[in-house]
Amino acid sequence: ARTTLVVDETMVDLWFDAPPPPPLASFCPNGNVITLGSAGKSFWGGLRLGWVRAPARTIAALAQTRDTLDLGSPLLEQLATLWLIENGDTFLPARREMLRERRDRCAALLREHFPEWRFQMPEGGLSYWVELPDMLAPQLATRAEAAGIHLGTGTRFGLSGSFDRYLRMPFSLETAELESALMRIKPLWLALNKGGQAFKRPFV
């Protein structure tokens, strides 16, 4: 009962197939629940602002702590974010549709050019969680980094190598940029996977 629950809802506005369930905090109105949101995820990546919803005493403590760390966020960006939150229903549907199209295009490219990789279609968000055979994901990420392409490896998202097989593959780029990046990754993958390693289980 004394545990503080921190809920990351930074992607909650970016659903494609079905609306998300109500906020977790709504099921525990008197509990100590901290919910995190992000204008950069919901609206535009260049808007480096987020928000926190929590009990008043928690917000007061966080605000006091923040005063010792920085001078605050730019007022103009805060006002822009407030307007976006209040008017999100007018343009979030178009953003979701754009991301849905990019998700689908990325899936088609992955299936065509990287048949050894496995993934599931995300129901929302900005990226795929891709599984590579034979623990090759960290090596591919290193080679891609040298070529100027940053891929997030699963290593940073788990302990003891539990996600070393995975890459986080964003699909939020414009289609031409996405295709260009994947075509640059393809020869790196082919050189790395000379033995043609693949999963024995069916591709999803």
Report each predicted region and the residues it spans:
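Active-site PLP attachment segment
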Residues: S26-A61, S73-L76
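Conserved glycine-rich beta-strand-loop-beta hairpin in the small C-terminal domain of fold type I
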Residues: L82, L99-A107, W117-E131
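Short, conserved charged micro-motifs
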Residues: M135-T142, A176-S180
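PLP-dependent enzyme catalytic core of the Aspartate aminotransferase-like
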Residues: A146-A147, L159-V204
